[in-house]
Curated annotation (Swiss-Prot):
Binds 1 Mg(2+) or Mn(2+) ion per subunit. Catalyzes the oxidation of 3-carboxy-2-hydroxy-4-methylpentanoate (3-isopropylmalate) to 3-carboxy-4-methyl-2-oxopentanoate. The product decarboxylates to 4-methyl-2 oxopentanoate. Its EC number is 1.1.1.85. Homodimer. Mg(2+) binds at D224, D248, D252. It is found in: Cytoplasm. InterPro entries: IsoCit/isopropylmalate_DH_CS, IsoPropMal-DH-like_dom, Isopropylmalate_DH. Substrate binds at R96, R106, R134, D224. GO terms for cellular component: cytosol. This is 3-isopropylmalate dehydrogenase. It catalyses: (2R,3S)-3-isopropylmalate + NAD(+) = 4-methyl-2-oxopentanoate + CO2 + NADH.
């Protein structure tokens, strides 16, 4: 099969981990006789340097003509000053909005060989395997009104409003129900309905949609309670659905269960994934650009590699190939190979390129 992909290496360690992801994808293409055409674009700090914006209209147009988009990392400390007119992260927000990517899917699975790598007791994290579904294009991050001002008396103020429409909530919640149906048929909806009106609407709509999924067990949990339970009993969860800001915070917390943010992939989809269908999406590791370790061959490429597996599953309809990448990662970890972020005594330490080569080697036989 033939596919056209837009590749956005981005900033910091982005180009390094992307190179390893494509190395593994090329191994899959060779084995299964697929063709992947890569077209490259700029995003983030490197795009600001060259074009003065974090995402150009040309790059966005290129993404829209692709079967899927691969992104590595966005962020550059040179642009951290909040007074600057443009920031690297603006490009990512514009990309999500421009491509209609409303559903962020983040699997959190702890490999048996990494149960001792997390800062949490092994007996707690062992067996953790759940999926976070985060609404991505609404809520406070896309606030309207959103402003900052100084009052006549000289007091500085700022406001960000959290707004959700019924349609925005319904489509992301249906993603949650569909994925729950393909797993253990258990869905946890996270909100703050004891305080926020937007959360009360969220909960009401979840209750209404649940009638269409009588085979799914639904639980409502407040965001603060969820934050505690993720650390105390992560194996309790299977599929979690929540709004934008809550999901942003909780998924970073959950990443520590796997021992490193370098282990966790993500997919941002423009539709509801269903078996036998292809859904346009953006695929990226959940980690940042990590500029302090860039160009040192020490970054962990596994999150990028697993993101490519998600792309094969959701946007290419290639479940067998996706599962093979995931199995290859498990085999490499079980054999004791590790990058510095997950290294422990007894492991064989590998650099970024070497880790990618090991995984590609297993796929290539």
């Amino acid at each position: 099969m033939d596919f056209k992909l837009t590749v956005l290496p981005g900033d910091g360690i982005g180009p390094e981990v992307m190179a390893e992801g494509l190395k593994v994808l090329n191994a899959v293409a060779k084995k299964y006789k697929h063709s992947f055409e890569y077209q490259y674009g700029l995003i983030g700090g490197c795009c600001i340097d060259k074009e003065g914006v974090a995402l150009s209209p040309e790059t966005l147009a290129m993404c829209k003509k692709s079967d899927a988009v691969l992104l590595a990392a966005v962020g550059d400390p040179r642009f951290d000053d909040p007074k600057l007119p443009v920031h690297p992260e603006d490009g990512l927000l514009a990309l999500r909005r421009g491509l209609g990517l409303f559903a962020n899917i983040r699997p959190v699975k702890v490999a048996p060989s990494l149960v001792n790598s997390a800062p949490i007791k092994a007996e707690i994290v062992k067996g953790t395997d759940f999926i976070f579904i985060r609404e991505l294009t609404g809520g406070v991050y896309f606030a309207k009104p959103k402003k900052r001002w100084t009052t006549p008396s000289g007091i500085r103020k700022a406001t960000d409003s959290m707004t959700y429409s019924e349609k925005e909530i319904e489509r992301i919640v249906r993603v949650g129900f569909e994925l729950a149906r393909s797993r253990k048929k258990k869905l946890v909806s996270v909100d703050k309905a004891n305080v926020l009106l937007s959360s009360r609407l969220w909960r009401q709509i979840v209750i209404e949609i649940a009638k269409d999924y009588p085979d799914i067990t639904v639980e409502h949990i407040l965001v603060d309670a969820c934050a505690m339970k993720l650390i105390l009993a992560p194996t309790y969860f299977d599929v979690i659905v929540t709004e934008n800001m809550f999901g942003d915070i909780l998924t970073d917390e959950a990443s520590m269960l796997a021992g490193s943010m370098g282990m966790l992939p993500s997919a941002s989809l423009a539709g509801i994934p269903a078996k036998g269908t292809k859904t346009f999406g953006l695929y990226e590791p959940i980690h940042g650009s990590a500029p302090t370790i860039a160009k040192q061959n020490i970054a962990n490429p596994i999150a990028t590699i697993l993101s490519i597996a998600m792309m094969l599953r959701y946007s290419c309809g290639l479940e067998t190939e996706a599962a093979e990448i995931e199995a290859a990662v498990d085999k490499v970890l079980a054999a004791g190979y590790a990058t510095i972020d997950i290294f422990k005594e007894g492991n064989t330490k590998l650099g970024t390129a070497e880790m990618g080569s090991q995984i590609a080697k297993i796929i290539g036989g």
